[in-house]
Design a protein with these regions (language model features):
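Alpha-helix initiation and N-capping motif
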Residues: 1-4, 103, 115
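C-terminal helix-cap and adjacent tail motif
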Residues: 119-174
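Generic alpha-helical structural context detector
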Residues: 5-12, 84, 120-123
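Glycine/small-residue-rich phosphate/adenosyl-binding loop
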Residues: 1-75
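Short gly/pro-enriched beta-turn/loop segments at secondary-structure junctions
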Residues: 50-53, 88-89, 117
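Glycine-rich, charged/polar anion/phosphate-binding loops
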Residues: 41-44, 106-109, 129-130
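Small-aliphatic-rich amphipathic alpha-helix that forms the alpha element of a beta-alpha
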Residues: 57-109
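A glycine-rich helix N-cap at a beta->alpha junction
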Residues: 15-26, 110-135
Length: 174
């Protein structure tokens, strides 16, 4: 519980900064039904309930050389596999960086050795609602061919792909 409370402290610190810096209490977020307001409520609830998450995973990397900006990338595929497996079993998961604000205290509490980087904080549990379909941007807007901004001809969305709202609206405008 002590670790979860510590991560919750980091989560509150990060969310309080982000909510102000990204305008989660101003602009469109003032409207209760706006996507930004819904996201802010979700984050408030997530951060408030952080000490109660059923499973908390710290993705760590044992360093074999000097730290570099790309080193965490070797941990993220494992984190992604964990999240995919959790979803396949009906669980929800979130990859965060909440450990960053309390890393020194975490290291002491968990006796994480020097030379080991904490690269990710992952929470897992049963979702409050149902998993909906995964929505994303069309592949041609994410994968370019020979020229930047020009969708690769082979980047074709699989049948049944659902796109995020802003892409659905774009399609309606055309």
């Amino acid at each position: 519980l002590e670790v979860k409370n510590l991560i919750a402290q980091g989560a509150r610190m990060l969310w309080s900064q982000k909510s102000v810096n990204d305008g989660y209490n101003a602009g469109s977020a003032v409207r209760e039904d706006s996507p930004k307001a819904r996201m802010a409520r979700t984050m408030d609830e997530y951060v408030t309930n952080m000490p109660n998450v059923p499973v908390l995973v710290l993705g760590c990397l044992v360093r074999h050389r000097e730290p570099n900006p790309e080193e965490g990338a070797s941990v993220y595929p494992a984190c992604q596999n964990l999240l995919l497996a959790a979803r396949a079993l009906g669980y929800g998961g979130v990859l965060t960086g909440f450990h960053g604000f309390v890393e020194k205290e975490l290291r002491e509490l968990l006796k994480i050795p020097q030379g080991t980087a904490i690269s990710a904080t992952i929470t897992l549990g049963k979702p409050a609602g149902k998993h909906g379909p995964v929505r994303r941007a069309p592949m041609k807007e994410l994968i370019y061919g020979d020229t930047w901004g020009e969708g690769a001809t082979w980047a074709v969305d699989p049948p049944g792909t659902q796109h995020t709202e802003r892409y659905i609206e774009k399609k309606k405008e055309k």
